[in-house]
């Protein structure tokens, strides 16, 4: 005589929590499966986004304000970007201005340091 699915469900429904836990362990052992829940896809995506933001490898160097020593800032901008005198002057007057795009963190910090030494305000994003 075969047992129906409904009879199995009735039997499982009549078990105590302890008996049900033992039954689950028996299923895991017999069939080589695990009853542990899997990670929710939404949580994995959110975690991945956080990891990406921590591992940013390309940065933009933005001249926020050229400060009082505009001539010194123009010289540094020319050195960093290779722009001509007029283009470098325009870049320092029209702030905020992106000086370098897609540079690594070390280069971005070096550029920021050089510009801040001559009085400019710089952002690295």
UniProtKB/Swiss-Prot annotation:
GO terms for cellular component: cytosolic large ribosomal subunit. Belongs to the bacterial ribosomal protein bL12 family. Homodimer. Part of the ribosomal stalk of the 50S ribosomal subunit. Forms a multimeric L10(L12)X complex, where L10 forms an elongated spine to which 2 to 4 L12 dimers bind in a sequential fashion. Binds GTP-bound translation factors. GO terms for biological process: translation. Signal peptide: none annotated. This is Large ribosomal subunit protein bL12. It comes from the Bacteria. PANTHER family: 39S RIBOSOMAL PROTEIN L12 (PTHR45987), LARGE RIBOSOMAL SUBUNIT PROTEIN BL12M (PTHR45987:SF4). One of its GO terms (molecular function) is mRNA binding. Forms part of the ribosomal stalk which helps the ribosome interact with GTP-bound translation factors. Is thus essential for accurate translation. Keywords: Ribonucleoprotein, Ribosomal protein.
